[in-house]
Amino acid sequence: MAKLNQVTLSKIGKNGDQTLTLTPRGVNPTNGVASLSEAGAVPALEKRVTVSVAQPSRNRKNFKVQIKLQNPTACTRDACDPSVTRSAFADVTLSFTSYSTDEERALIRTELAALLADPLIVDAIDNLNPAYWAALLVASSGGGDNPSDPDVPVVPDVKPPDGTGRYKCPFACYRLGSIYEVGKEGSPDIYERGDEVSVTFDYALEDFLGNTNWRNWDQRLSDYDIANRRRCRGNGYIDLDATAMQSDDFVLSGRYGVRKVKFPGAFGSIKYLLNIQGDAWLDLSEVTAYRSYGMVIGFWTDSKSPQLPTDFTQFNSANCPVQTVIIIPSL
């Protein structure tokens, strides 16, 4: 890390036609972070893209690779307002058992390439503010009138990647019956439980293994071969909190389709069911009974706030819809 070289990132973006040139900015002696940022002709824009590689431990076992893109939203010919930005951010942390080798450093470069393929990063690259492109083009051409703004969507549509197979829901799902008891103030309606139904998702279990960017992701997955199981690296998937969903307050919040349901029998229990597909409702108590082996998986789609929230209350069925439900296999 003592020597940093200029790096050109080419063939990036949706169409593979974007190129960014990053210039070394030095190593921070306090935290060991080495930074490269885009060298643009407009000084106020130089920090739009930053790639950092950190080695915080003295024995160099831990590496953290980060990419941050900042897109100024208010530009003139010579400057931009740095206080107004849209950002996309992705990172990955790698731990090694010894001093870094050429192979391990090659793995970091591979991870960097994987991060650049992150849909949120791709979106930020392809959908930069039109005024930003105008400022860059004017600066690179030596003056003149600003070119017309590119056709950039106001709210890019971020969608989850397609699955590679089929996966049957490993937990019981049911239809909803009629209302068993009308809710009173501060409590939701209670429904009767309907017939059991089978649910199959258009994903294979392998589509989700190897992802290190989950909230409370099971650490046993680190034993998987990340070189071959990286298709979910940093792609916006997240482990939704099935425990927090099981409350009257959550049902009343309407953030996800959760209903309070009375199971059959004179002594039938009251449970919380989550709508996961059509008229199929998942028994959340079965998911949490597995104590982190079961997971309800959502996908973050809000391109206006690309960085995944750490607060579960910020998630809802619009910005992070449910994609599938899995059981993590024993290793």
From Swiss-Prot:
Its main location: virion. It is found in: Virion. It comes from the Viruses. Gene3D superfamilies: MS2 Viral Coat Protein. The keyword Transmembrane does not apply. GO terms for cellular component: viral capsid. GO terms for molecular function: structural molecule activity. Keywords: Capsid protein, RNA suppression of termination, Virion. It holds the Pfam family Read-through. InterPro entries: Levivir_coat, Phage_RNA-type_capsid, Read-through_dom. SUPFAM superfamilies: RNA bacteriophage capsid protein (SSF55405). The keyword tRNA processing does not apply. This protein is translated as a fusion protein by episodic readthrough of the termination codon at the end of the capsid protein. Readthrough of the terminator codon occurs between the codons for Tyr-132 and Trp-133, thereby producing the readthrough extension. Minor capsid protein. This is Minor capsid protein A1. It comes from Enterobacteria phage SP.
